[in-house]
């Protein structure tokens, strides 16, 4: 496949984001020298440099370790880039940090810029975009926010860098992406681009887009909008189907969803969408038909929670596989049988089906995926939180050496080793004393 048809995430970095105090990099690049499960790695060459990219990753860690914060940070960066500024918004995202940015800084830090860095491949270009935001302290609503630093690189060459001033190198941008006649009066163009730039606005989506390279910025924004799908709360997904001939009370059978649900073991004859009488929306519904009953019911009333959840998530999987891109989901596997998810993982590892090299990233508590026959060591990620500093740390199983007391050897039982705390990112939990105290007091647990 040509590079132009591939859209992949290479890495994502953060600093001073919620529980992540220090700079942390989440990598989707294959670890050097690691062998095995090569079918889950694909190669992309950009400007003569070969990149070995992972097609999946699973993230482990105890409750409150920061797993969701890592995924939430991807969502926040996406929202900021698409909005083009760092002002609060009332758009109602489930990720409150995307709406209320004073929730972002690590508690206890002062005057430390929050960092977001992302590196991805789109249309044969290696794109790296970095923003550092001065957001003040945690919950500081009155702080005058500003962009501390902003850098765009294409194929490892700096296109622009913004600090106190902005330096633009349009010679590092292919001519086809530049605005017409921009090179005829570059100094005047720079002055116009910088003069109207507010401190809380991104140069990328404002002056750089308007004055220098509209087509390049459109390409970047397209990746964030359509190729990076971050589901911060996967239990909240409600897919709405649009139809050109929408009629009230009409039932639209969805063959694909029905086939998927039958693999799951649904009780109804078919799944589809029924048009609401009150609005121009549709409701996922089950059709029940036998010799005694003929009815259409909302699927949430009739099917199991896990079935409805999987059916709502499945269109996202289809879209990623058909169009390419990166699908990131918080607790993707909750209420879904692990065998179903294992099949999805294997599909992302299958070049005959995953022809556009889509990527799947999710966090989980289910240890069944700690399997050397399912995931490579560099695809198994961990997040743990220090009990003293309350800061999160992220690492991969491939970061461990292959020898020594905590070494990870080929063919080992990853699940067993995880539960004996060989890899960290696990916490002993014992509610016995709390419950004994409550019971001994006759159930009175008032403080």
What is the meaning of each model-derived region?
Residues 56-60, 276-318, 326-339:
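Conserved ABC ATPase signature
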Residues 101-166, 396-412:
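P-loop NTPase motor core
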Residues 14, 118-124, 152-154, 287-292, ...:
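Short acidic, glycine-rich loop/turn motifs
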Residues 2-76:
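Pre-Walker A-like glycine/lysine-rich segment at the N-terminus of P-loop NTPase domains
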Residues 44, 50-58, 62, 72-135:
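Conserved P-loop NTP-binding catalytic core
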